[in-house]
């Protein structure tokens, strides 16, 4: 399956299908976590399923000169694609929480506008959007104003390490996760920048035996480290967190490349690609869909698999509807004038 060369966002970043597949896998893991498939699964996926999205964001980060893109323009574009959906879906879920579910409590609205890593109405996953926005802005500013690569690395390391412990101060807007996200973005940026060097090319195109060996080591270390939760600032052993997040992401990229190669043009491959492409809708609406479906079934494994299947189907339909209609403004996509009059 060939790489699509179409522009995917205002930053002129090309879509790479194996990365959309990887996003799709990450989204499915996130939804499974919200359905709850047990502590063992939760420990496994939590080690990397949120870090991977920051790494992917860094992978596609492109250096821009002041003439190409001002700092204000960058912040505005990121606000459009991350903060606009954050606020729209956050208020949407609050209205359901308040008027339909009858919870006459304004605390979730307060949390939406402040300490959003807990207490949101229905869609707790929205914290990720504010964290990703802040991480992108910080990373852009560092890239724009710090030109020495070694000083840049030191600054990013200090921010990332500080982020591992910042939650002790309970900052608003998931700031601790954003600080860690800056470090994860730099990992993604370096993977992309040096992907054609011998060492990084080897890591991103593992043969079967190295792939299995690294998988075994990573899974073992994930369970050695135990519980990780970026939202709450829980990392257990920070060194193991950074290794596991990076190694699992590298393995995920390898797996996605293999899926693209083996299942090219199949329904499975196309489905994963579209989940990845429409991932923001899945992030914003999955918990509402899960809650609705969970009302009608009990918690046995078979029913959880049914909830997962129907959730993916419903979210897929909703995402296509939003992206293909004038509603796409709620996910930060522009609406052309002709779309409003025809």
Predicted regions and their residues:
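Alpha-helical transmembrane segments and their immediate juxtamembrane cytosolic regions
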Residues: 2-342
């Amino acid at each position: 399956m060939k790489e699509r060369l179409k522009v995917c966002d205002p930053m002129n970043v090309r879509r790479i299908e194996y990365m959309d597949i990887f996003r799709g896998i990450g989204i499915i893991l996130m939804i499974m976590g919200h359905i709850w498939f047990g502590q063992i699964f939760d420990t496994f996926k939590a080690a990397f399923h949120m870090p991977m999205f920051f790494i992917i964001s860094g992978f596609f980060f492109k250096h821009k000169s002041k003439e190409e893109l001002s700092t204000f323009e960058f912040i505005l574009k990121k606000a459009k694609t991350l903060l606009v959906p954050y606020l729209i879906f956050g208020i949407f879920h609050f209205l359901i929480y308040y008027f339909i579910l009858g919870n006459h409590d304004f605390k979730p609205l307060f949390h939406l506008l402040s300490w959003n890593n807990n207490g949101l109405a229905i869609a707790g996953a929205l914290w990720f959007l504010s964290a990703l926005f802040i991480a992108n802005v910080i990373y852009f500013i560092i890239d724009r104003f710090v030109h020495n690569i070694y000083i840049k690395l030191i600054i990013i390391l200090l921010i990332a390490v500080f982020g591992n412990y910042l939650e002790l101060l309970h900052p608003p807007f998931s700031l601790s996760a954003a600080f860690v996200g800056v470090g994860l973005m730099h990992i993604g940026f370096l993977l992309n920048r040096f992907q054609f060097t011998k060492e990084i090319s080897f890591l991103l195109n593992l043969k079967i035996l190295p792939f299995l060996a690294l998988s075994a080591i990573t899974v073992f270390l994930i369970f050695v480290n135990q519980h990780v939760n970026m939202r709450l600032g829980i990392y257990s052993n920070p060194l193991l967190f950074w290794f596991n997040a990076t190694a699992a992401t590298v393995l995920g990229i390898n797996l996605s490349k293999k899926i693209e190669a083996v299942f090219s043009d199949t329904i499975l491959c196309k489905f994963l690609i579209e989940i990845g492409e429409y991932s923001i809708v899945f992030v914003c609406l999955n918990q509402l869909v899960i809650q609705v479906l969970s009302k009608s079934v009990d918690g046995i494994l078979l029913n959880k698999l049914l909830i997962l299947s129907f959730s993916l189907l419903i979210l897929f339909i909703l995402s296509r509807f939003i992206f293909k209609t004038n509603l796409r403004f709620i996910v930060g996509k522009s609406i052309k004038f002709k779309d409003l009059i025809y």
